[in-house]
UniProtKB/Swiss-Prot annotation:
Coiled-coil residue windows: none
Reactions catalysed: glycerol + ATP = sn-glycerol 3-phosphate + ADP + H(+)
Name this polypeptide is given: Glycerol kinase
Native organism: Maridesulfovibrio salexigens (strain ATCC 14822 / DSM 2638 / NCIMB 8403 / VKM B-1763) (Desulfovibrio salexigens)
Signal peptide: none
Binding site for sn-glycerol 3-phosphate: 13, 81-82, 133, 243
Involved pathway(s): Polyol metabolism; glycerol degradation via glycerol kinase pathway; sn-glycerol 3-phosphate from glycerol: step 1/1
CDD domains reported for this sequence: FGGY_EcGK_like
Residues where ADP binds: 13, 17, 265, 308, 409, 413
Length: 495
């Protein structure tokens, strides 16, 4: 039977999805299933890794109800990054819940490592900061806090993996224990320059090397599905990348200096820096973009904590409208925010500030300020924060941004993208397919089996739904941005 499709498994923070793509990069089928969020203590976030596996089996079975498995050329996996699973390799069962990227339960471990002066070493070797966000301290926490776990780990009976690793292990019936360069680069344990697990950091974290998966390129046949899992078929699993890197690949940002921004609950921006790992002096992370065609390419990354969730706050907390889509309607009723600035630091500020203690603020209110000004100022705050991060990227890389590609739920808002283009002074491109994360995983998988010939073949599929060009005078944009910088400074001073 002709191989017509590639199946993407998109394992996210709140749901698992299966998406089937054809050769033109068009979606043929989407299935989705949510799973339980577990909050054992304030600031802790966990998932049941067996429930995640069950949700993946469910969405895959549903997707293959209409498309014969025999027509699937390959499977690609993209995943919530950093989320940590530790399981017994003999029973196949996790020894503890998966500790999610958002979870802060390892803050004490992070503080101990910082007190030992390890921050500069970790920064130089991994491109990351010592933070509870990343996997390394989560593995240590499980070994230190789950009865018998450390003994089992030292006996070689426990395995660690981020979600990609866990899913491949399950899909292959326990035959394959691998991760890819992108996911390894988010663990806090991987040397992104030497491309190996770092012994010095493993020793500091007291994590046995025997637990760790083999690190492979992002596009390679890792193994086949166990025939019991896929309608009796053995299908190659041949692409893997963390969600943000997969989106960069799905947006065809293959050249140095190309960047994408994902507007979700928060924002994630990545800029391709080519075969050079650029160290950041401006509060960004240095990470691996992908390993494809026998070479590793790098990216600068900036995370904004609050973006779409600020619009949700206007809807749910302030009751300003019933549907998030109405934010565009209200914001277009005024020509500007009339000097009103909103700094949405509800959970602190991410890149490039990294201040977890600061809280949100509004500035410039008068008797003439209306709900419409509030809403517009909130949308503008997403765009100002994006400019903050992209300015840091330009300063670190020495590359001037030529255009920005965008994806995520909020990009349906035309006004938001026009404001973004105005503030950046460059075109903003919204692609035809906004499922860029799943598409990136599909492309990586398809490349490995020859479903797509090369990156040029993929580029041909990339279509722009709409391009937003700057309409605002540069002097006006600069003046508004200066006001934003003052607002952030004042917000950070108020604690």
């Amino acid at each position: 039977m002709e191989k017509k499709y590639v199946l993407s498994i998109d394992q996210g923070t709140t749901s698992s999805r299966a998406i089937i793509f054809d050769k033109a990069g068009q979606i043929q089928k989407v299935t989705q299933k949510e799973f339980t969020q577990i909050f054992p203590n304030p600031g802790w976030v966990e998932h049941d890794a067996m429930e995640i596996w069950s949700s993946v089996q469910s969405v895959v079975a549903e997707a293959l109800a209409d498309v014969p498995a025999a027509e699937i050329a390959a499977i690609g996996i993209t995943n919530q990054r950093e989320t940590t699973v530790v399981w017994d390799k003999n029973t196949g069962k996790p020894v503890y819940n998966a500790i999610v990227w958002q979870s802060r339960q390892t803050m004490d471990i992070c503080n101990e490592l910082k007190e030992k002066g390890l921050d500069p070493i970790v920064r130089e070797k991994t491109g990351l900061l010592i933070d509870a966000y990343f996997s390394g301290t989560k593995v240590k926490w499980i070994l230190d806090n789950v009865e018998g776990a450390r003994e089992k780990a030292e006996a070689g009976d426990l395995l660690f993996g981020t979600i990609d690793t866990w899913l491949v292990w399950k899909l292959t019936g326990g035959a394959v224990h691998v991760t890819d360069y992108t996911n390894a680069s988010r663990t806090l344990m991987y040397n992104i320059h030497e491309l190996k697990w770092d012994e010095e950091i493993l020793e500091a974290l007291t994590v046995p090397a025997s637990m760790l998966p083999e690190v492979k390129p992002s596009s390679e046949v890792y193994g086949n599905t166990h025939k019991d899992k896929f309608q009796g078929m053995e299908i190659p699993i041949s692409g893997m990348a963390g969600d943000q890197q997969a989106a960069l690949f799905g947006q065809a940002c293959f050249e140095e200096g190309m960047a994408k921004n994902t507007y979700g609950t928060g924002c994630f921006m990545l800029m391709n820096t080519g075969e050079k790992a650029v160290p950041s002096k401006n509060g960004l992370l240095t990470t691996i973009a992908w390993g494809v065609d026998g070479k590793v390419e790098y990216a600068l990354e900036g995370s904004i904590f609050v973006a779409g969730s600020a619009v949700q706050w206007l809807r749910d907390g302030m009751r300003m409208f019933r549907d998030a889509k109405d934010s565009e309607l209200y914001a277009t009723r005024v020509q500007s925010s009339e000097g009103v600035y909103m700094v949405p630091a509800f959970v602190g500020l991410g890149a490039p500030y990294w201040d977890s203690e600061v809280r949100g603020a509004m500035f410039g209110l008068t008797r003439g300020t209306t709900k419409e000004h509030f809403v517009r100022a909130t949308l503008e705050s997403l765009c100002y924060q994006t400019k903050d991060v992209l300015s840091a990227m330009e300063a670190d890389s020495g590359i001037e941004l030529a255009k920005l590609r965008v994806d995520g739920g909020a990009v349906a808002n035309d006004l938001l993208l026009q404001i973004q283009s105005d503030f950046l002074g460059v075109p903003v491109e919204r692609p035809m397919c906004i499922e860029t994360t799943a598409l990136g995983a599909a492309y990586l998988a398809g490349l490995a089996v020859g479903f797509w010939a090369d990156k040029n073949d993929i580029k041909k599929n990339f279509g722009i739904d709409r391009e937003f060009d700057p309409k605002m005078e540069e002097t006006e944009a600069a003046k508004l941005y200066e006001g934003w910088q003052k607002a952030v400074e004042a917000t950070m001073a108020f604690k």
